[in-house]
Amino acid sequence: MTERLVDLMDRTFSATEREVIYRLIRSRRDIRQFAPDPIPPETLLRVLEAAHHAPSVGFMQPWNFILITSPRLRAQIKALFEEINEGEAHRVADQSRQQLYRSLKLEGLMESPLNIAVTCDRRRGAPFVLGRTPVPDTDVYSTCLAIQNMWLAACAEGIGIGWVSILDYGKVERLLGMPAGVQLIAYLCIGFPREFRARPMLEEVGWRSRMQLDGLIFQDCWGQPCPWLSRESVASDENEQP
């Protein structure tokens, strides 16, 4: 019991430490503009260690990280992006919005000093992974948690990450020689950013606005508001405290 209490005390974070975490979450951005400076290996290893400490279903740890440095390979992936991106632009019916879409920089494949493909080995731990059978995609969700850990750690190191989703992931998997049963989850550009925006780029340019949290919280069933957990109610309770 004493050892357990000591452990709990060690896990108590100061107000300053808590604020650092929240600041990281609020300031994280999807980066597209990169400086060419390489990431020091010891820094990159720390970032990947953070990813590797993510929670995973049944402690499956389904992730792998393919570091892509080959200019030829990255040029092939850039060509895939350009093909898909042109098709996506044509899907935007409104002409002014299509023009806005075409003006956006949505990748840093060649500019960033490193690309990383994050994969999910869906065979790992087979034939039985504790907790996965009822929801088979929990291995994919686990890999996404590793990506979030990686992103926040990178942000803490002053490093930017950009997730490139405008790709044919099946073609990328073949380019990377990935075996059957291993799925590409994220293709990331990573490096020191030329800038950190105050707000997400898509919010700044007017593509989308951040939704109000109050409208996203329900109680007991879909669509039923949770009046006691709104900004207004919490602020009112704080003001009433002596």
Each model region followed by its residue ranges:
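Short acidic N-proximal helix/loop "leader" segments that mark the beginning
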Residues: M1-R46
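C-terminal helix-cap and adjacent tail motif
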Residues: T2-F13, E17, Y187-P242
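Short alpha-helical scaffolding segments that buttress acidic/His motifs in well-ordered protein cores
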Residues: I25, V47-A51, L188
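Small-aliphatic-rich amphipathic alpha-helix that forms the alpha element of a beta-alpha
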Residues: V47, A51-H52, I116, R124-L175
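Glycine-rich phosphate/pyrophosphate-binding beta-alpha loops
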Residues: H53-G58
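Glycine/small-residue-rich phosphate/adenosyl-binding loop
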Residues: Q61-T143
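A glycine-rich helix N-cap at a beta->alpha junction
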Residues: N85-D94, G177-P200
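Short secondary-structure boundary segments
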Residues: C120, I166, F192
